[in-house]
A protein has these predicted regions:
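Short, charged N-terminal helix-start/capping segments
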Residues: 6, 11-34, 132, 179-205
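Active-site-proximal cap/loop segments of hydrolase catalytic domains
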Residues: 134-249
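The conserved beta1-alpha1 loop
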Residues: 106-108
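A fold-wide structural signal in alpha/beta-hydrolase
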Residues: 102, 126-136
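Peripheral, non-catalytic segments that deliver or gate enzyme domains
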Residues: 1-99, 110-128, 168-172
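Conserved catalytic motifs of the protein kinase core domain
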Residues: 99-101, 180
C-alpha cells in the first residue's frame, strides 16, 4: 500500500502468488480486493487499512484443498541470455525426479500479460501429479512496452527461443523429461506451438494442443523464410518421419 507521495505505507501479505485488484474510495478506512491464483478461484476480501488486516468476504466453494498445492516463480536464461519468468504450480509433495507430466502454456504476443488465474479444468491434472507451467514470453507486456516489442516482427524468434528454453529448463531441473511435456497455445499461441517442432526437432515434445492462427497476418514475409528453411520434411506427407503428435481445433 502506497501513499499519494509514492512512499510505501504497509505491505499486504496475500494468500499466495496470484493476481489482485482493489476497489474503494480514497477516504475510506476499508476497501475490498479480489484475489485469484492458479489454485484459488476468484475470492473477495475486506481490508482494514488502519490495522493492515484483511478477512475473507466471499469465495466460491470448491471440492479440493488449495493448500495441497504450491506455486513458485522461477527465472531461466533464454538463448540470448535474457532472464524469462515462469510460474510453476504443483502438489507440495511432488518429487523432482524427472518423471512428472508438464502442461506448458505460452502466448507471447500483442502486449498481453499472462497473470496467475484459476481454471477448474487444471485441478484434476494437478491432483494426479502434473505440473502446470505458465511462461511469460517476450511479446507480452509483463515488463512494459520494451518486453512487448522484443517479441514482435523481426524479433519474433525471441518468443520461440524463450519457449524452447522454458522446456529445457524444466528438463534440466528434473521437473520432467522430454517425453512428458505437452505444449499448449491458442490464437497467437497457436503459431507458437505449431512452429516449435520445426525449430526444435531434437527436443521432440510429445503433444501439442493448439488453435490455428492467421500465420502471416502480422509477420513480415522475409521472417517466414526461416520457418520453412528449417523444416526440410513435408509436414502433411511425413514420408516415414516422426513428428510430435499435434491436435488442432
Amino acid at each position: 500500500v502506497y501513499g499519494l507521495d509514492g512512499k510505501q505505507i504497509q505491505e499486504i501479505q496475500l494468500p499466495s502468488l496470484g493476481s489482485v485488484g482493489f476497489s474503494g474510495n480514497k477516504d475510506d478506512k476499508e476497501c475490498f480486493f479480489g484475489f485469484t491464483s492458479f489454485t484459488i478461484p476468484g475470492a473477495t476480501y475486506k481490508y482494514d487499512m488502519d490495522q493492515n488486516t484483511y478477512e475473507l468476504y466471499r469465495a466460491p466453494k470448491v471440492q479440493f484443498n488449495s493448500d495441497d498445492f504450491v506455486t513458485e516463480q522461477v527465472f531461466f536464461a533464454s538463448k540470448d541470455g535474457v532472464k524469462i519468468p515462469m510460474f510453476l504450480t504443483y502438489k507440495k509433495d511432488l518429487k523432482k525426479d524427472g518423471k512428472n507430466p508438464v502442461f506448458l502454456y505460452g502466448y507471447g504476443g500483442f502486449g498481453i500479460s499472462l497473470n496467475p488465474g484459476f481454471s477448474a479444468t487444471r485441478i484434476p491434472f494437478l491432483e494426479n501429479g502434473g505440473i502446470y507451467a505458465q511462461v511469460n514470453l517476450r511479446g507480452g507486456s509483463e515488463y512494459g512496452e520494451d518486453w512487448h516489442v522484443a517479441g514482435t516482427k523481426m524479433q519474433k524468434q525471441n518468443v520461440f527461443d524463450d519457449f524452447i528454453s522454458a522446456a529445457e529448463y524444466l528438463i534440466d531441473q528434473k521437473y520432467t523429461n522430454k517425453d512428458k511435456i505437452a505444449i499448449v497455445g491458442g490464437s497467437n499461441g497457436g503459431l507458437l506451438v505449431v512452429f516449435l517442432p520445426v525449430f526444435r526437432d531434437r527436443l521432440l515434445l510429445r503433444h501439442t494442443d493448439n488453435s490455428v492462427p492467421t500465420i502471416a497476418r502480422n509477420i513480415a514475409d522475409k521472417l517466414l523464410v526461416p520457418y520453412s528453411s528449417q523444416n526440410p520434411f513435408p509436414v502433411l506427407h511425413g514420408r516415414g518421419c516422426i513428428h510430435p503428435e499435434e491436435r488442432i481445433y
